[in-house]
Amino acid sequence: GGGVGDLGVVGESALFRAMRAARTGRMGSIVSTIQREQDVIIRDESRGVMVVEGGPGTGKTAVALHRAAYLLYVWREVLSRTGVLILGPNSAFLEYISQVLPELGETGVVLSTVGELFPGVVPVGVESVVGREVKGSVEMVTILARAVRRYQVVPDEPVVLVVDGVGLEVSPGLVRAARAAARRSGRPHNEVRGLFADFLASGLARQWAGLIGADPLGGENLLSAGDVAELYDDVVSDVGFVGLVDELWPVLDPRVVLAELLSDRGVIARVAGDYDEVTQGALFREVGDLWSASDAALVDELAELIGGFSGVDEGVGDGWRRQVADAQGVLDVLSSSASSDLDDVSDAEVLSAFDVVDAEGLARRQEVREHRSVADRARGDIRWSYGHVIIDEAQELSAMEWRMVMRRCPTKWMTIVGDTAQTGSPAGVDSWAETLGPFVGDRFVTHRLSVNYRTPARIMAVAERVLGLFAPDAPVGVALRGGDDGVVRFCAAGTDPWAVLPREEGRLGVVIVADSRKGETPGVLGVSDVKGLEFDDVVVVDPLVIVDDSPQGYQDLFVALTRATRSLVVIGELPG
């Protein structure tokens, strides 16, 4: 057995093997076609969205990686500052890339799965098919907005706040008006907390002024605007008022909001009332359950709705706050020293450090520049804007995940690689136009790779039988490896897969089962584990179970059948 480096991501090795094995007269024209198609994609310098389509074995991933290297060379000055994000389908794929292209790690490239894109959210939990579909749907935008609004509280009864011995009534009407003013701003929750508090404090200051400044003769209030402003200051500095604002409009953390939402069936029912019980149940998880891959996009959406949240590295944030506090201490010392040192008017005209810089500015001047690489800084910052984004197996991204990715690339300079015939996620892509339309309209270009140089024609013939059942009009790449290349065997259901898997030195074999069955047998992989990977020998177990395992079951089976480069064994009946 080999390490991850032996797992074959569809790459140049397959092309070279095919070229060495090919003996037909059309080889020259086919290689020319491959080179022409790939070169156009790799060297396309347009600064927009490019979709690269192609069936199994057409080298989509290899082209995407070559394009990454090309862009990093041509646009080095821009991309060395902004970084490049490469999203892959699984950790094995990303580890392979980091091994075969180690130089990418030195040029500001961040490798990630979409489920790991939000800092601090580590997807370990297993998500049900219905859960993935629901969490991936764009309807979650409305559900999450409702979840945030739950924290913007209006009390059922008036609350009496005692400030300097005076009882002030915080009525539901006043809170409702403050909430409406904050919401009208259209800004995120945490960022309008100050506006909410200001409206509330202003109302209480006016109420206080009415109590103590009323003219006994019925004239105008005896307090001046300055007096009312002082009352306002007394209200906002009152501990009770600060605590009340915390209750009515708390500072939120998107991860906490999502965890509290998903672990409370009652809250789910209130914010997702349009869903039936089964669908609502798919959102529920027990308190303390681990994050799943679908959760990252939801946390990211909440971060957008909540605002005032820079990322996850609280340690870095705490360090910065300490730096600012230390800098303020230095300025305070300088200020007090200066006031005692000034002997005459001319000295007072001398500019000192505290006259031209505040604490935050001084702290920033002392900060060690570029102490982390571009990739490290980008990886930990949810507001980072990447110069370019490359997405492999992009057909798997849900509507919510596309929203998250698009936020990472405001310029929309992206290379999107995928094949909708292989979409395994129930929330994945059916149409590039429908998926990309909300973000870029029709402003994207599409390239198609037409030559399958990895999968032997014999093996593709089996896969194409399945493809015809769900996408009969889908284009199929011309198989370069024809003739006697490739072995296909069919075995009865119940056959021991390990007994029929070839065991030859230097060849990598795998047994593929339905995702729901992979925990039953040690050593096997589920369909979702083999996305983007190639193997010499493949055994596919129980095709009908794979089909029944997911709403995208036919696509999953198509993926499983097209992972082999030398031999394919099918245990059990094929559909149709």
Q: How would you describe each model-predicted region?
A:
Residues 171-388, 397-402:
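Conserved helicase NTPase catalytic core signature
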Residues 1-17, 277-287:
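N-terminal accessory nucleic-acid engagement/regulatory domains that precede
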Residues 60-61:
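Conserved lysine of the Walker
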Residues 64-77:
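Walker A/P-loop NTP-binding motif
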Residues 52-54:
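Hydrophobic anchor at the beta1->P-loop junction of P-loop NTPases
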Residues 46-50:
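Pre-Walker A (Motif I) flank of P-loop NTPase domains
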Residues 32-44, 377:
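Pre-Walker A adenine-sensing motif
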Residues 77-82, 91-135, 339-388, 393-576:
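Conserved helicase motor core of SF1/SF2 NTP-dependent helicases
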